[in-house]
Amino acid sequence: TMGGVFIAAGTFFGFLIAHINFWTIGQGFKVEIDYIVPEVLSLLLFGTLMASVGFIDDFLKVQQGRNLGLNAKNKIILQIIVASIISYYFYTWDLSTTLYLFSGFGVDIGIAKWFIIVLFIVGFTNAVNLTDGLDGLVAGTSTVSFGGVLVMTFWIFRHQNYYTNFMNDAFLSLDLSILVSSIAGSCLGFLWWNTNPAKIIMGDVAVSYTHLRAH
């Protein structure tokens, strides 16, 4: 039930190996990448934090020998704590709190934006958990989802002159591409073993880890 550990490990090592390749060889792009973008590293850490909640849940299931891990109340509390840490991190960015309902029309929602972020992350994580009832469903949809993000982030990197207001750091979009491609590759590799009949179950570790799509 803890097959998601392989997805998390595959993502970490894929991301690390890609950066080692850039640091040592650097071929393929006319850029020199000698660091990991802090924003992308934070996403990786946040994914690990949320996955740790799923790990506790899965570990209790294995330890008790039955399909009962954390109860709903404790699980939600832990998810809210992690989501609050993530929300506070975004708060330190001094981002705009204006919510645009229509083009040219926005409403300043103030501090409510950070509560919305917490609600969105917790809600998205549990929504993904609901889709984990069929073999290969979460792994398959996650592969497609992260694959789509990969196309967008890499496109922005290759056309960075058109997105200077959106991506001030040219390496940010490329580093995001590396991260999401690592996750997509891990999900795709896991899908081989998770299709019906599943030999390995994803578990709450991977379900919680794939909440990165919410960011």
Predicted regions, residues:
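"…together with the soluble PPM/PP2C metallo-phosphatase catalytic core" -> "…together
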Residues: T1-R213
